[in-house]
Amino acid sequence: MSEVRDYAKEVSDWVDGVMEYLEKIDITDSPLLSNIERLSGLAKNMDEEEMDYEDMVLIEEEMARVYEAIEELSREFNIQEGQSVPIGKHTLPPLSYAYDALEPTISREIMYLHHDKHHQAYVDGLNKAELMMKKARETNDFSLLKHWEKEAAFHGSGHYLHTLFWEVMIPGGGGQPRGDLLKQIEKDFGSFAAFKSHFSEAAKQVEGVGWAILVWSPRARRLKILQSELHMVLTQWDTIPILVLDVWEHAYYLQYKNNRAGYVDKWWDVVNWPKIAVRFTEAKKLIWKEQ
């Protein structure tokens, strides 16, 4: 019974996050709301005797439909708003899959804490920093500006990297990319195997906590692998991240203990190459003249 309750709570939390996001973009009348209401009802009516594999599939399919609709609404909202988020109004993006969907690679407990607690803390920290700097402008008191700029850099980078991190993973992922992305990887790194080894070692060798990041450089017109300590140290400007791997301890420690290498090696099983390929295609559209 407890496992069913836990799953029901996760679905309910996901629905709450979706509703918060829809409220933010002022969606009050949409066919999507009926889907969300149906999903919420499924979560509330879960019962251990009645819950079976088909029920879970039904819930996962409903969540996928809701997420696809949200992505479309989000695109429309960004166009209408000029891709602008009001100061201090960043929100936690909902996941497109349940917290247990990446098991056994990443446990449900890790995903819940990582997304619902850690990522939310970055969102809150970014919002607070933005509002405090807005207040500084309004009062012409910049005595704490250095502090709030650091807070914005840390929490803002954490928020944006985590948002991408959730997107580049998917249940049943893995394998290797195809098409133009694979060709570019082979061109820039020699082979997919060489790229994978390089990226994995970059992740394993991050000093302390941080990220491994595959970026597209519009000026160099090639892919690069970067490390980032914390969320924003040792990276390069004027590049576009297309694949990121979180190697902060909160991303793996509850499951892999101090075996970061084991986590990195298993993580490739959930990589969402189709999504990464889309980001690569869009990133290549930005062209700068090399200076």
Locate predicted features.
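Feature for soluble, non-membrane regions of globular proteins
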Residues: M1-Q291
